[in-house]
A protein has these predicted regions:
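Accessory, non-ATPase domains that flank or precede helicase/AAA+ motor cores in DNA-metabolism machines
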Residues: 1-291, 296-297, 301-315
Length: 316
């Protein structure tokens, strides 16, 4: 067996290398694992991009070397995320190694080099004694979201309708089924009512992150998500690239907000990325806004999204 590897933590030109898989590694090898290669007599780290049985004819087998070491048994970029990586590189004209940087924390390679990449078993306790009561309209909408066959839903709501209660009910449902959920909110509202309300209901052990969180803490949360310890994640657009093991719903609040479009290399649109994740997996996508974007409304009109409304204002 052979594999393609792409550079991790280094800037190379647009290429990948072909290496042979030693027979001792064949049973344990997976796409997305980090491997060690001595390149030009230097220790470098790469990610397995593709595995194949037969070597391409244009490559001389005698020139192919073997991987030195698999540095971590866990695959941080599973098969469908490799497809997502390819999509980003092609759709946004981004070199593959630049796109890869979206999927792995900056200091991960340093932990790999030092042999300090160890998962800590962290127990997350989510539920409080508080109950989440829905109005008749909210309960009806919740059931419709769950039963809807179209995985992609656009929720058009009015101010005062308390759509956060719908979010909580959805997160609670998937948590009880031991599944992972992701709620994306704009950077500017990370400390707003949504985050506070969710903290009050699920306690403070759910993951809530923003750009002020340190790289070390991001890596810690990265490992918690990969190991399935963390079930509920609230974050900005970059959370889409984290290694969820069993992600069943992505909720994007204020989907019209410009902060979902990255202006840094590699540039990307988080709404498009979330759509692609839904296409590549079983994940349901819920886009919510009181002023939906033109693109989202167009998709709803053309049945790419199921359009649902929440126009009833909540009364205490």
């Amino acid at each position: 067996m052979f594999w393609y590897v792409i550079p991790f933590g280094k800037s190379f030109d647009e290429f990948w290398f072909t290496y042979e898989i030693p027979k001792d590694f064949e049973k344990d090898i997976k796409v997305g694992q980090i491997v060690k290669i001595f390149l030009w007599e230097k220790e470098t780290f790469w990610v397995i991009y593709e595995i194949f049985e037969n070597i391409p004819e244009k490559i001389e087998k005698s020139k192919i070397k073997k991987i030195e070491e698999i540095t971590n048994q866990k695959s941080f970029i599973n098969a469908y995320r490799i497809e997502l990586l390819k999509f980003i590189s092609k759709n946004y004209f981004s070199p593959i190694h630049n796109s890869l940087n979206l999927f792995l924390p900056k200091n991960l390679v340093e932990k790999v080099k030092k042999g300090k990449l160890k998962e800590k078993i962290k127990e997350y306790k989510y539920f409080s004694e508080k109950k989440n009561s829905l109005t008749t309209a909210q309960q009806s909408l919740f059931k419709e979201i769950i039963k809807e066959e179209n995985k992609k839903i656009l929720l058009f709501w009015v101010t005062g309708s308390w759509k956060t209660e719908i979010y909580i009910k959805l997160l609670e449902k998937y948590l009880k089924e031991w599944k992972q959920s992701l709620l994306l909110i704009p950077e500017i509202v990370l400390t707003n009512q949504i985050a506070s309300r969710l903290e009050n209901f699920f306690w403070k052990n759910l993951i809530i992150l923003n750009s002020t969180v340190s790289e070390a803490k991001k890596t810690e949360y990265f490992l918690d998500i990969a190991s399935w310890n963390a079930k509920i994640v609230i974050w900005t657009r970059s959370a889409l690239f984290y290694p969820f093991s069993d992600l069943w719903i992505i909720i994007i609040d204020e989907e019209h907000d410009n902060s979902y479009i990255s202006d840094q290399t590699p540039r990307y649109n988080a709404i498009e990325i979330a759509n692609k994740i839904s296409d590549l997996s079983w994940c349901k996508l819920l886009l919510a806004s009181w002023t939906p974007s033109v693109n989202s409304m167009y998709k709803a009109i053309n049945w790419d999204y199921k359009l649902l409304n929440l126009f009833e204002k909540f009364k205490k």
